[in-house]
Amino acid sequence: MMTSNILSRFLPPNGSPSVYETIRHHDATSDSSDVEERAGLTLEDGSGEHYSDRELEDAMTDAERSRLLDPDDAFIRRKSPRKASVAGPSKSNSRHRHSGRPRWAHDASPGHDFEDGDDDVPASLLVEGHHDDDDDDLKSRLPPPPTSHFTPDNRQTSLPGPSTRGDRARWRAAREQQPLHHADRRRAPAVRWSLGQPNLNTVDPKEKAMWMWANVENLDNFLKDVYTYFLGNGIWSILLNRVLSLLTFAFVIGFTTFLTNCIDYHKVRGSKTLNDILIEQCTTKMSLSSTFLLWLLTLFWIGKAFQCLLDIRRLKHMHDFYYYLLGVSDTDIQTISWQEVVSRLMTLRDANPATAGAVSARHRKFMGSQSKQRMDAHDIANRLMRKENYLIALINKDILDLTLPIPFLRNKQLFSQTLEWNINLCIMDYVFNEQGQVRTLFLKDTHRKALSEGLRRRFIFAGIMNIFVAPFIVVYFMMHYFFRYFNEYKKNPSQIGSRQYTPLAEWKFREFNELWHLFERRINMSYPFASRYVDQFPKDKTVQVAGFVAFVSGALASVLALASIVDPELFLGFEITHDRTVLFYLGVFGSVWAVARGLVPEETTVFDPEYALLEVINYTHYAPSHWKGRLHSDEVRREFAELYQMKIVIFLEEILSMIFTPFILWFNLPKCSDRLIDFFREFTVHVDGMGYLCSFAVFDFKKGTNVINQGDRREPARQDLRADYFSTKDGKMLASYYGFLDNYGANHRGSHPATRRQFHPPPAFPTLGSPPAGEMGTIGDRLDQTQTRHGLAGPFMGQQSVFGPSRYGPTGLGDHASPAPSILLDPHHQPSTSGFRGTSRAAAFPRYRSSRAHPPTSGTIADGDESPVATGGSDPSRPAANAAGASSAGGVGTSDSNLGDSWRMNLAEDVDDDNTEGGENVDAIAGGAGVLGLIQQLQRVNKDTRGRTAVGL
């Protein structure tokens, strides 16, 4: 009885279908894109059959066969349901259509049966003319199939007629009077584009690459292959990497087996040669568990090697795609930028009619989420990071409970590589289908309880599986880490204290739609600044002890080294302790001295942790709200140190995580099941041609930064709760928006080098060009300037920024880069010229203040709906930055002064902007003002300079 009660907690009740059966049934009966399904536009036959994305490809390939079969003939095929019914239901329901006819030419359902026994005119003559026009347009834009060196036999395809005898007779009479096809067209061979076509091996590689590009079924998987090929630096580098990985795995397993089973360690002390301690035929004397494990790992290695061989063909296809269609060779792929690859993909999309527009209007509904028209930089990033964007949002919104379920470690978060694998297995593979799309079942609240219960069981099952797999993984990782880093630590013992970001920190720092290589570049540039920040804090007690240990160990090592130099033959064999010679103690004291010396900072290091952390934040873009005003505190340092730990500690946590991961999967994550199901339902949006995406990853370029409604002021509490729930924390979305525009901005190929960030290593002390903390404003001012109630926060202001010229630069000057459209974004993704205006809620303490009042503008024409405050003067109740932005919003023309702040990424007030000078025309001033004009300009400059302070100059 007790056993049945326990099992009933994990098994579904009797008589109710499993959640997986419900998901499979829903996936089988629902279209991949449910926009048409929800709108009631899905085409169905009498049996309720749905269409798949493959049907569009069949429709396109059969258009070539229209040289033999007219659209009228396809219509006549649909007029014979009785003939199809005679063959039996087994053939009609078979998934393999031997007739070669696509389902879009299916038999008409009873609701659409136009056949009537009293009709005097053949059904083919009742077809409207627009079908011919539609298919003719399709055929005109379709590329020719790849040519072959041989021609198949010409065959005449019989044209099916109506089902009744009278209609068949009338049909023959109509054909005699008006033939539908010419004889030469009837004798033309019907070439069908298919992956199984044998003549593809003999075609030209370029035409074959173009054909494969035109027949891509899953655009997400194809773009992932393109990106993986880019990261792998070509086919030969990828193959070499995989071969070396296989050899590394084989060496670790083989060498570990040799060390544990083939050496008799009891004979080591008295033996002189290796043969004295070797065990003969050691593999036959291995234990049963060791033999089973060795065979299991051997089979795994063989499977990986076989998979590597199978991938050669796919890599060759990708090599041809890069070389022939994108014009990128294996030597150039190591130096070309991803932005250039995206640009060439967009050019290929526009140049290839089969992918750009060779789809008729009646077939576009089949495209679903595989539209190649939606393939600019934003769409490609969303496709590549469809799952990663959800995980970034889960980490940002703290949906996952990653704390250890241990009483004395409940405040410790654990997120290792092993736990990440389990999360992808339990959550992502559960929510996404085989095509990489979110299952529409998760978007309906009617199945919330069943889906949540299924997710909870997946967590528990994964925890059980980790118990059996963990011992093998622990042994492998320990041996691999030992073989890899022991020699490095032996040569340079100070590397033991080297640090790197934890896996949890990487997911916290990563932004939406930020590809891995761009994120890795940004994070790698932050390492020098992060190490400098950690070393900034005073460690007086540790420094004193480390200095003493370094002095003692260095003195002992120096004496032993000097004695060995005087008489090396005698002294190197001298035993200081039993069986411990001078050489042994030289290694010990030298290692201790190196470690202790590494803990002592340089004497010339200037202590300024606040400035050092600002430099780190400029790269990581991570600044929690509770850090405001506390960057100098030790609490912030400890919190940052948890994200930036020593490599040896990260490795130990990875090993321990294999023990603690089952407990997290059993006790913590099942409690988050309801929140996880709600998260995917509430933060998923559908984009036409793309499918379902994370709502945070769909940037509204037209609205820019003003994407959050300020709400009703009469209910501030309710507005804040709802806005906080549907927004990201710590300004993640705005930082992602800015970062994306900087990575894929206008002319990213280097025509404007001033917009590219130059990397400089951290100085030993703040440079003379950096203002002191007092002149830069307080930390609270900086946080208030960049953070708002709704989470619209950008990175901290500092002297340097990975976004090119700092938007919040210490001088307070605006970014005068041109708002030219990006060539990597389609027109509907181009940033709006009014997308960067400040929100209605400004900072409580503006960071940059001008000591003089802005004169009213006189040279601009304001819109009729603008208030007098926006067009002239200043209102003390409104922020100065918003007033400045509004004063230039109604200008006309295309000059800098008329564009105003709409395209600028600087949220601070521009003290030296041209608009503050009364809106004068620069061309009029520079072009022949005369002596009097120059005198007036000089007087104006002297008048303005008197009121300025040293801030911002």
Swiss-Prot record:
It catalyses: a 1,2-diacyl-sn-glycero-3-phosphocholine(in) = a 1,2-diacyl-sn-glycero-3-phosphocholine(out); a 1,2-diacyl-sn-glycero-3-phospho-L-serine(in) = a 1,2-diacyl-sn-glycero-3-phospho-L-serine(out); a 1,2-diacyl-sn-glycero-3-phosphoethanolamine(in) = a 1,2-diacyl-sn-glycero-3-phosphoethanolamine(out); a 1,2-diacyl-sn-glycero-3-phospho-(1D-myo-inositol-3-phosphate)(in) = a 1,2-diacyl-sn-glycero-3-phospho-(1D-myo-inositol-3-phosphate)(out). Forms a homotrimer with a solvated central pore, which is connected laterally to the cytosol through the cavity within each protomer. Acts as a lipid scramblase that uses its central pore to function: the central pore opens laterally to accommodate lipid headgroups, thereby enabling lipid flipping and redistribution of lipids added to the outer leaflet of atg9-containing vesicles, thereby enabling growth into autophagosomes. Phosphorylated by atg1. Atg1 phosphorylation is required for preautophagosome elongation. It is found in: Preautophagosomal structure membrane; Cytoplasmic vesicle membrane; Golgi apparatus membrane; Endoplasmic reticulum membrane. It is a multi-pass membrane protein. This is Autophagy-related protein 9. The keyword Signal does not apply. Residues 459-479, 648-668 dip into the membrane without crossing it. Phospholipid scramblase involved in autophagy and cytoplasm to vacuole transport (Cvt) vesicle formation. Cycles between the preautophagosomal structure/phagophore assembly site (PAS) and the cytoplasmic vesicle pool and supplies membrane for the growing autophagosome. Lipid scramblase activity plays a key role in preautophagosomal structure/phagophore assembly by distributing the phospholipids that arrive through atg2 from the cytoplasmic to the luminal leaflet of the bilayer, thereby driving autophagosomal membrane expansion. Required for mitophagy.
